[in-house]
Every structure is written in C-alpha cells, then in structure tokens.
Regions:
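Acidic carboxylate diad motif detector
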Residues: 1-33
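Positively charged, helix-rich recognition surfaces that bind polyanionic ligands
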Residues: 20-21, 33-206
Length: 206
C-alpha cells in the first residue's frame, strides 16, 4: 500500500516474504531504473540457530579467472567472459559513444534534439540494467547451489576489494565480478539457513 497511490500490484510473485513465519517487513521504498519501477523492502528475518550438521564445511575462493572455486571441487565460471555478456558489453560501448556524440553536438549548438538525446540515454540505462541483472541472477543461482549442499560452515576470504579497485588494470574486472554483493547475499542466505559463515584474512591456513 503506497501513500497517495494505494495498493499496487507487483509483477513478480514470491520475492517479498509476506507469508514466511517470523519474517517482518519493516519498511519499503519505490525507485525507478531505466523507465521501470522497483520496490525495495527491509525485512527482519528470524535468527536461525547454527545447526550441528555432520556434513563437512567448505571453502570458497573468489577470483577473476574463475568466479568461485569451491573446496568440494565445484568451479563457477566467470560469467563476464561468456559470449552473451561480451556481446552486451560491446553494444553498451557503441551506445555510450553515440550518446557522447549527441552531447557534444548539443554543446556545439548543432541540431541534436533533446528528445533523441533522452531516447539514447534510456537505451544506455536499459542496457546497463540488463547487464547488472544478468550478473545478479548468476550470483543468486551460485549461492543457492552452494547452500543447497548443506555444509556445516562456509569459509571465504575477506577480500580487500577497495585495494583491488585502485589497480587501474584490474578495477573494471573486479567491479564486474560484484564480490561485495556475493558476500552480502551469502551472509543473508547462511543466516537464513543456519549455516556458519567464516570470513578469514588472506593468510588464513586452509
């Protein structure tokens, strides 16, 4: 129920945990991205006790060549090297260049119409959003598959992402891997499933 608008139907079902026991929706907000409206909610989830699971724990190494290598032998590829994302990245570069030319023409007083400029800007935004969604979906599926094995604990390295971003040769590749998003979502999923998450420094013996 949105103030001044009333009840609004959401396109996707099941994303907001309205029927899960112990889950409490605390607040919400509506935003617009690439001409689409999105709702974000803050949800309080119950503290599930860490289970005394007889299964072994696993370790996860995140990287640039491969996205994640799990100690159980499973490897998750770097999706940014897939043909699909490479094609979309090339499209994005072309559309960004076209947008830059339209801005330059506008500054020079040439006949670029503002409507055409906004149209091209929306194309760039939509492509950015599409690429982000593909990466986020891959992270969600990777985490779901890892957690599904029901390890007693999961160990990951406390990556210095800020330090890695300072390397101009690696910054773009690091940003596209979304390591922080992976860690944040993994923490939430482990908490939900009662799995202990161990975040260790790079010198931790494993």
């Amino acid at each position: 129920n949105i103030p001044s608008l009333g009840w609004v139907r959401i396109k996707e079902k099941g994303y907001i945990p309205t029927t899960k026991d112990g889950y409490v929706i605390k607040s919400g907000s509506v935003s617009i991205k690439a001409d689409r409206f999105y709702v974000s909610v803050l949800v309080e989830i119950p503290d599930n006790k860490i289970t005394d699971d007889p299964n072994e724990g696993i370790g996860i190494d995140l990287g640039l060549k491969e996205f994640a290598i799990v100690s159980n032998g499973k490897t998750y590829k770097n999706i940014n090297r897939s043909a699909r994302l490479k094609k979309l990245e090339k499209q994005l570069i072309r559309k960004q260049r076209s947008l830059s030319r339209k801005y330059e023409n506008l500054k020079k007083g040439e006949s670029t119409q503002r409507a055409n400029l906004q149209k091209q800007k929306r194309k760039v935004q939509k492509l950015h959003h599409k690429i982000d969604n593909i990466r986020a979906d891959y992270i969600n599926k990777t985490i779901a598959e890892i957690v599904k094995t029901k390890p007693s604990y999961i160990t990951i390295e406390d990556l210095n992402v800020k330090g890695m971003m300072k390397n101009r040769h690696l910054s773009k590749a690091v940003a596209s891997q979304k390591f922080y998003e992976f860690r944040t979502k993994l923490q939430a999923k482990c908490r939900e499933k009662g799995i202990e998450l161990r975040v260790v420094d790079r010198w931790y013996p494993s």
